[in-house]
Regions:
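Helical "lid/coupling" subdomains associated with nucleotide-phosphate turnover
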Residues: 1, 5-20, 35-38, 43-192
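Short glycine-aspartate micro-motif
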Residues: 21-25
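Active-site-adjacent helix-turn-beta-strand microarchitecture at beta-sheet edges
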Residues: 26-30
């Protein structure tokens, strides 16, 4: 695992968590949402919405790609509504920092192609990605995103989750540092 040691990323991280921010860590079995307000950790919550868990469920339901989006949305919304009531309340979250093995590599690569250091994705770029994932074939997507074909559905599920959470929180920006935050990095920053 790699921590944010790169000072430029560390700077961006600190600047971003000064505002109301959520760190979204998407794993295979669950997702973890950590809320920051003025760079203080407010809450950390695990939801059973992992990408591999959802993929297994979709396979079990024999879901085609057309139903996939609706089903992931429904499954996520059910858990996220409770989450919102309990933890978000009326907080407006400005930014989401996403940590995963699915979307982040794509966002980082896109940023490098544009010659930018930080992989910040706004709503427009995100909509374009969703549209591509919705309409293009797996083989073409794998080529374009430079990933293995079996990873494409996982990227799609991750994107649907991220979009749902961004909508729920009213977030404007998604930042993918392209590193795994080490456990405790949040606390490290909060304690400084």
């Amino acid at each position: 695992e790699m921590c944010i040691r790169d000072s430029s990323k560390g700077e961006t991280f600190r600047r971003i968590i000064e505002e109301k921010t959520a760190i979204l860590d998407i794993g295979g079995g669950s997702i973890q949402i950590s809320l920051f307000d003025k760079d203080t950790l407010v809450s950390t919550q695990n939801l059973r919405l992992g990408v591999l868990r959802l993929q297994e469920l979709l396979n079990h339901l024999n879901a085609g790609s057309t139903q996939m989006e609706r089903l992931v949305d429904e499954l996520a919304t059910a858990q996220l509504d409770d989450y919102k009531k309990l933890y978000l309340k009326d907080r407006e979250i400005k930014n989401i920092i996403i940590v995963d093995d699915y979307l982040s590599p794509w966002a980082v690569r896109k940023a490098h192609e544009r010659g930018e250091v930080n992989a910040v994705v706004d709503r427009k770029a995100f909509s374009q990605l969703m549209e591509a994932l919705r309409t293009k074939g797996t083989t073409e997507l794998a080529k374009r995103m430079d990933i293995a074909e079996e990873k494409v559905p996982l990227v799609y599920i991750s994107a649907i989750l991220t979009r749902r959470i961004a909508e729920l929180m009213g977030a404007e920006l998604v930042w993918a540092p392209g590193v795994t935050l080490c456990d405790g990095i949040a606390y490290e920053y909060a304690e400084q």
